[in-house]
Each structure stands twice: as C-alpha cells, then as structure tokens.
Amino acid sequence: MPQRHIFLSAYGQTSFFSIQTYLAMSSIISYTLSTKRHTGIGLFLGLIPLCLQTLHADPLAFEKACLQAFKGEQLPEFSQNLTQLRKARLAQASRLPNPSVFYEQESARSTDAFNESSVGLSVNLDFIWKRGSRIKAAEQKNSASEFELSSKQLKVSYEIANMFIDYANWNKELKELGTSIKQHEEALTISRKLLVKGIISAFNLKRIELRMDELRFSYKELESNLAGLLAEFQLWVSEEEAIPANANLLYDISFETAEKAVEHALRNRPDLLAFEANSKWKAEEVKKYKNEKIPEVSLDISAKKYPGDNDGFFFGMSMEIPLGEKQGDVQFAESEKVSGTLEYKRAKRKVEREVKAAWQIWHHLQTDKNSSLGRSQMSEGKNYLQGLQSSFANGEASVIEYLDGLGSLLTGKQNTLKRHHLKQSAYLRLTYLSASTPSFSTPKI
C-alpha cells in the first residue's frame, strides 16, 4: 500500500528577512505612537545590522545540515577510526603464532666423545582450536561499535530536525504577533479619534497600550528564543549566519498500530542493537576463555648433529598446562555475559515503553480533527473582526469588545500553530524512537 505524503504548512511561507524586518519596523512604529515621540534616525539605523545579517543568511536544507552537523561532531573521523579499529581487532584475533627457531649445543666436560648440536623450529598449535572463537568475539564487538556510531548519527539527525520545525513554527508565531501588534496600533489610532470626539475616555487608550505592552513582551521573548535557536544551529553546522531552510516536514512514515512501531524499533534501533551485539560479544567471550583453558601444545622439529659423521632428526611435542594463569577468566566472562543479557532486556523494555507512549501521543494528535481552527473558521474570524473594527470606528462597539475580538483571533491562531507544532514534535519523536529517518521537502521560493 503506497504511503501518503502530508505536507505541514500553515498560513503560507514567509522568509526570515521579511518577518524580522516587518516586526522590527512594527516595534519602532508602535513605540513612537505609544510614547508620542519621534523615532529619530538612530532607531532607523538600528535596523541596518539586522537586515544585513538576514540578507547574508544561508538557508541549509535538512540533509546538508545533518551532514555538516556530523562533521561538527567529528562522526566521519569516528567512522574512519572505527574502520581501522575493526580491522585491527580482527587482525589481532586471527593472527597466527610466531614460530621460534632454536639452537642447542650439548657436550660433556673433558671429552669430545659426547658432543651434540641441534637446530630446530617450534610452532604453537593451539591456534587451530582457539582462533575461531577469538574471531567470533571480535566480530561481535565490531558490530556493537558500528551500532553505537549509528545511534550517534540518529541522535544528531533528531536534534537538527527539531531545530527545523522549531524555527519554522516560531517564525509563524512571530508573524501572527506582529500582525496583532499592528492591529492594536490601528485600534489605538481609532481610539484617539474617538477620544477627540468625546465618545470614549482616556482610560480606554491606556487599556490598549497595556495590551500592546503584553504583546511586545511576548514578541521579544519569542524573538530571544529564536535567536538562541539560531546560535545553537550555527554551532551545530559550524557555519556562521546559517539558518534552517523554510522546509515542510513530510508525514511519510505510517505505523497503523503501536505494536508495528515497536516491532520496527526492535529491528532497527541502533542503540538497542548495540546492547544486543554487546550481549552476544560477552557470550562469545565465555566460549573464548573456555577454549583458552585448553592446554597449549607446541610442535618441535629439529635436525641433530652427533659425534662423528652421524646426523639425526628430532620430532617432539610439548604441552603447557594452565593450572593457575587462567583461573577466574571464565567465571568473570560468565558474569559479564549475565550482565550483558540483563542490560539488553532492560533496554528492550525501555524501547517498548518509549515507542508505545510516543505512538499514542502521535495517534491522538493526528486523529483529533476538532482541536484547532480550520481555514473556513479563520476566514470567518477575520470577517467578524473586520465588521467589529467598523463598528468600533463608528463608536458602536466598545474598546473592550474590540480588544476581546483581537485577543480571541490571536489566541485561535496561536493555538492552531502550537497544536501544529505539537503534532510535528510528536511525529519526530516517534520517528526517532522507532529508528526512522524524517524527511523534509523544501518548497520553491
């Protein structure tokens, strides 16, 4: 069954430059109106660094941002080192014993009747039945190391993906706050005209100014969060002035049930697979140490020279019995095996809990269709506000009624954006915990 791609979008896409410049201009205008003072050239010049910084910003696609973050975390170097370590570990486990060459001279004092010499070669033979277990143990350890590296890559991708959705949603929230600030500025202008006509009192102007102060504080707080996010993102990708591309998160991974999500996670979670590989490695270590207790056997072959012209050939075998040197190795390895098995089972239960909880949250947000304003409701709200503004300008609606209308519309938009953000975050967490890779589609500008 083909999977359906669902694009995450809300109220259109707006560039970071247009949002920031618009909000900065709105703040300056509102400051001028509320304090009844002229702005001055100094405040205007304050916009120049912001505009220049944004113009030079370089949007990064999700895939490129992940690659640069991998480099920043030195994961390519870790991968290269892991390759060398993997080769070295296998070479160490599969190496053959070095043969030893020996020379012996035997003679009796005060006589030449007994004078023997021999040249020979001695080879350790225990590698024949010990080498296989050593190689298997090394291979399992290599697998564990590879999964650990994959787990780091998955974690970095998840962090970058969260920055992408945070950046996009916070920009949309900033845009809505800027629009609301502008609407309140218009309300303040209308109120001044009504004050001159004697329709309302000066107290109503103060009420609007207090509401604008609240909006400006919310805007500044969100702007600070966005600045912190950009600073962190630029450190992640090791590139100054870089910003996340204005991308759409695709809902292209579907798990019909929590059980299917858990099954996918158990098969693909690199951190869990690393625990499993470590458990198998410790089991192979037990086999290896049991084989190490088998006596070491060496084969000796030599040519002997006897007194006179007599030559001879010597063949022999020697055995080293490990009475004390290997004691405790098997018991230690068996304890480590039990520990590895318990760690894997605990990690498996943890994965099951995490994925089931993440799936339930995502499923609830995905199936709840009545939790946010739709486009038709948003259009109705805007039409209602336009009518209310007209009534307010004619003195038919009170300041409180108009402010309540503005506040309700902003709250509805904010709740829609926050719900949208929660849905994206829940989806990302589910993909991360189930070891699935999220994908973004960057729209054409």
Which sequence ranges carry the predicted segments?
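Sec/SRP-type N-terminal targeting helices
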Residues: 77-81, 94-95, 126-156, 203, ...
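N-terminal secretory signal peptides that target proteins for export/translocation
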Residues: 1-36
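Periplasmic alpha-helical coiled-coil/stalk elements that build and connect Gram-negative outer-membrane
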Residues: 152-268, 358-365, 408-409, 416, ...
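Bacterial Sec-pathway N-terminal export signals of envelope proteins
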Residues: 55-105, 124-125, 133, 139, ...
